[in-house]
From Swiss-Prot:
It comes from the Eukaryota. This is Inter-alpha-trypsin inhibitor heavy chain H5. It comes from Homo sapiens (Human). PROSITE patterns: VIT (PS51468), VWFA (PS50234). GO terms for cellular component: collagen-containing extracellular matrix; extracellular region. The gene is ITIH5.
């Protein structure tokens, strides 16, 4: 969708000034002394606004991507100037937020229902020209405004998309085209896949129109300055080129697309099912199946407009494709202009001779005449139907048409609705049509509807692109059908509002995705049935997938929760469901010719899009403003409506898996994993990755106690304290009272002194200027190496100097019980920057190791692998840590908002012998107390 945001903020005519000419520096003046006066006047160029920052942050959680673009500009001129922000976004993405800061005014985007009459500042325009429509598979978002003299402006754009699997890989593409060199340019991508990341690659920068089929390309490595940190389930990719590196790539600031490709591990044939807060998503991508035979007719436009390069490239591509056909396949070729020319009047078996003859036929095709799209499609469908009718019921195969044209129907039937109706009636759902449109004159809407209505896909090839390589790449996606007539069923008593569950074909390297709502959140199992046909037989897969809380993963996406009926924290699976449902409603609306039905679909799609803040053809964006800015916001660096911080989600695949999607620096053996945490009542978890052990303990404190969690004030300058709040114990519980973390305070002493106070409702940042951030709004602020990312009602991520990161979970209750309190959880996501002298209830273990020994009373089995133990009373053992012998017992503990279950060795009695000193030694006098404690003193003696 192409958006042109023309903000009527007082347009003015901008002319050059003496001050602008001087901004080019003394060297320009010295050069001017050597040239005549009239030439020197021409050199006094107008100073355009300077882009001081261009940054993109993207988080992919189980294929669902949240992306936020931040752009800051400065008007160095002495007069007001027009500025424009533009960003290419994937065509499949939905814009969810746009915010603009002009001087001291904030303009906040709001998604509303589209009205026929619009007097708003936001104007939308769709232009099908190559210049306006961006690169292949993208659309351009534009916003323009006037920036006052010597003032600043900032733009923040957020969008979401579900990554599609093609050729065995998910591809995430980010446009890096700031239009000028920027002193602060960065792309930061986090990938979290609980199934495990099987492969990951970063491609060289591309301009999309230069990209081809993907065969044998992209082997020159990632762009310069790219850093990749990866472990089993998490990857962080950072692209941060200097100005010099940017200039070497493109001096005009149009660097190209930053592309990441990856795939995930797959275990069960039934697929990967993830559940969260009453929503589920089912990823189905079976492998190791024999390919289905395919019956394919290649329909090639040979009208006069195809003369020259387009026809030559297409012929070369078909030569390659014919050699890829399998012996069990059957094929034919049709060329069409104002006449329909069929190579053979029946489908031909694949043999060396038939491939040779087909290539000869293609070679002799010559461009002439008009374009009879209807006649060509009818002839191709008749060929396929004739073969299927005579092949017998035992012949399981897939019938496909690959249709390529560069124009509109000009001969025969030219009425679009008639062509669509004729094709639909002839195909009868038995033939899938895959269309490719070349150039600017093609009727792409017709091709799109032909594919949508006939179980196919469509691709657009721009005029400057290599049509042949695009055809090969498109064919590669459909060259290997593995299943047909796929149906995935769930019990109606368990699942409602599921997305599409019927699929005509499944091609190797792709993926089927279904999402829906669970009727009962406490459901023990989700029954799944998959029926399909492959080359040999009819397949039925049935299984009950456990969805118990201890088997499910808890996610903290940080994306706003604008709708839905779930409780608790934000849910990326819910947003994935809303994304898929909206897409399917839009597709159904596009296919429908019945006006009442179209209106019903439009209303449903519109209501859902407004609820989840998706910008669609049925919604519009209005900028509300100006509104007051929060104190100190103007100087905050990196502010954005970021969606998707560091979450954790676990797949439901019939067996529990260990969470661990945390940052790992390459070539460094020590890993700081975010299981190291304090959460709940309060429950402490310490991970020892080198020993493959997790240890847990409780601290039974008193309301008002301030616990020192991390103490590294002297070295890294970081101190973290947590204040407890009391609550009554649940009925029939063994405790007299509960305590939770009410407030987390963080003191950073280097390089500049900053104070952070975090509660479930707000974040206070005091680093000279006091800044108050509400926790119900997503925002990112930063300065002096400190970044604070608030994800609405979900979590707060604090990053210090890029080497220390804490994630504070926000636990809110819609209707809290008497024993429940809004509270916080504290997780150490990255401890690389903390020193070896770090102490505190959690900090003292960050640089320690531990080992397990047998209990003196008798041997224990599988002590380092408690997952292998039988469920029941946990065995006891002795833990050796920091020279102490600590009795422990195996337990299971819930973390990440109480939904994910881990196995750990539990130390009783307020962690006696496990921690240095005793519990009272870790009590601080006030929230920002950094004074030396007994524990800290002992830590320096160890």
């Amino acid at each position: 969708m192409l958006l042109l945001l023309g903000l009527c903020l007082g347009l003015s005519l901008c002319v050059g000034s003496q001050e602008e000419a001087q901004s080019w520096g003394h060297s320009s003046e010295q050069d001017g002394l050597r040239v005549p006066r009239q030439v020197r006047l021409l050199q006094r160029l107008k100073t355009k606004p300077l882009m001081t920052e261009f940054s993109v942050k993207s988080t992919i959680i189980s294929r669902y991507a949240f992306t936020t673009v931040s752009c800051r500009m400065l008007n160095r001129a002495s007069e007001d100037q027009d500025i424009e922000f533009q960003m290419q976004i994937p065509a499949a993405a939905f814009i969810t937020n746009f915010t603009m800061l002009i001087g001291d005014k904030v303009y906040q985007g709001e998604i509303t229902e589209r009205e026929k009459k619009s007097g708003d500042r936001v104007k939308e325009k769709r232009n099908k020209t190559t210049e306006e429509n961006g690169e292949k598979g993208t659309e351009i978002f534009r916003a323009s405004a006037v920036i006052p003299s010597k003032d600043k402006a900032a733009f923040f754009l957020s969008y979401e998309e579900l990554l599609q699997r093609r050729l065995g890989k998910y591809e995430h593409s980010i446009s890096v085209r700031p239009q000028q060199l920027s002193g602060r340019l960065s792309v930061d991508v986090n990938i979290l896949e609980s199934a495990g990341i099987a492969s990951l690659e970063v491609l060289p920068l591309h301009n999309s129109r230069q990209r081809g089929s993907g065969r044998g390309e992209d082997d020159s490595g990632p762009p310069p300055s790219t850093v990749i940190n990866q472990n089993e389930t998490f990857a962080n990719i950072i692209f941060k080129p200097t100005v010099v590196q940017q200039a070497r790539i493109a001096q005009n600031g149009i660097l190209g697309d930053f592309i990441i490709r990856y795939d995930v591990n797959r275990e069960q044939s039934i697929g990967d099912i993830q559940v969260l807060n009453g929503y589920f998503v089912h990823y189905f991508a079976p492998k190791d199946l024999p390919p289905l035979p395919k019956n394919v007719v290649f329909v090639l436009d040979s009208s006069a407009s195809m003369v020259g390069t387009k026809l030559r490239q297409t012929k070369d591509a078909l030569f390659t494709i014919l050699h890829d056909l399998r012996p069990q396949d059957r094929f034919s070729i049709i060329g069409f202009s104002n006449r329909i020319k069929v190579w053979k009047d029946h489908l031909i078996s694949v043999t060396p001779d038939s491939i040779r003859d087909g290539k000869v036929y293609i070679h002799h095709m010559s461009p002439t005449g008009g374009t009879d799209i209807n006649g060509a499609l009818q002839r191709a469908i008749r060929l396929l139907n004739k073969y299927v009718a005579h092949s017998g019921i035992g012949d399981r195969s897939v019938s496909l048409i690959v249709f390529l044209t560069d124009g509109k129907p000009t001969v025969g039937e030219t009425h679009t609705l008639k062509i669509l109706n004729n094709t639909r009636e002839a195909a009868r759902g038995q033939v899938c049509i895959f269309t490719i449109g070349i150039g600017n004159d093609v009727d792409f809407r017709l091709l799109e509807k032909l594919s949508l209505e006939n179980c196919g896909l469509t691709r657009r090839v721009h005029e400057e692109e290599d049509a042949g390589s695009q055809l090969i790449g498109f064919y590669d996606e459909i060259r290997t059908p593995l299943l047909s007539d796929i149906r995935i069923d769930y019990p109606p008593s368990s699942v409602v509002q599921a997305t599409k569950t019927l699929f005509p074909n499944y091609f190797n390297g792709s993926e089927i995705i279904i999402a829906g709502k669970l009727v009962d959140r406490k459901l023990d199992h989700l029954h799944v049935e998959v029926t399909a046909s492959n080359s040999k037989k009819f397949i039925i897969l049935k299984t009950d997938v456990p969805v118990r809380p201890q088997k499910a993963g808890k996610d903290v996406t940080g994306s706003p929760r604008p709708g839905g009926d779930g409780e608790g924290d934000t849910n990326h699976i819910e947003r994935l469901w809303s994304y898929l449902t909206t897409k399917e409603l839009l597709s159904s609306w596009l296919q429908s010719d019945d006006e009442p039905e179209k209106e019903r679909l439009r209303q449903r799609a519109q209501a859902l899009a407004v609820s989840y803040r998706f910008l669609t053809p049925f919604t519009s964006m209005k900028l509300r403003g100006p509104v007051p800015r929060m104190d100190g916001l103007e100087e905050a660096h990196g502010m954005s409506a970021a969606m998707g911080p560091e979450p954790v989600v676990q797949s439901v695949r019939g067996a529990g898996t260990q969470p661990g999607p945390l940052l790992k620096k390459p070539y460094q053996p020590r890993i700081k994993i975010s299981k190291t945490s304090v959460d709940g009542d309060p429950h402490f978890v310490v991970d020892f990755p080198l020993s493959r052990l997790t240890v847990c303990f409780n601290i039974d404190g008193q309301p008002g106690d301030i616990l020192r969690l991390v103490s590294d004030h002297r070295d890294s300058g970081v101190t973290v304290n947590g204040e407890l709040i009391g609550a009554p114990a649940p009925p029939n519980g063994h405790k007299k009272q509960r305590t939770y973390l009410r407030t987390i305070t963080i003191l950073i002493n280097k390089p500049e002194r900053s104070y952070l106070e975090i509660t479930p409702s707000r974040v206070i940042l005091d680093g000279g200027d006091r800044l108050v951030l509400p926790c119900n709004q997503s925002v990112v602020v930063g300065s002096w190496g400190l970044e604070v990312s608030v994800s609405a009602n979900a979590n707060v991520t604090v990053t210090i100097q890029g080497s220390i990161a804490f994630v504070i979970l926000i636990h809110l209750y819609k209707k809290p019980a008497p024993f429940q309190r809004h509270h916080l959880g504290f997780y150490i996501a990255n401890s690389e920057g903390l020193s070896s002298n770090c102490h505190g209830l959690l900090g003292q273990f960050l640089n320690q190791d531990a080992r397990l020994t047998e209990d003196p009373a008798g041997p224990s089995q599988n002590l380092t692998h408690p997952l292998l133990l039988q469920v029941g009373e946990g065995p006891e053992a002795v833990l050796t840590v920091k020279g102490h012998q600590v009795p422990v017992v195996w337990k299971q503990r819930k973390i990440y908002n109480g939904e994910e279950q881990i196995d750990c060795w539990f130390a009783r009695n307020n962690a006696a012998k496990l921690i240095d000193g005793e519990y009272k030694d870790y009590l601080a006098f006030h929230p920002f107390d950094t004074g030396m404690t007994l524990g800290q003193g002992m830590s320096r003696e160890l």
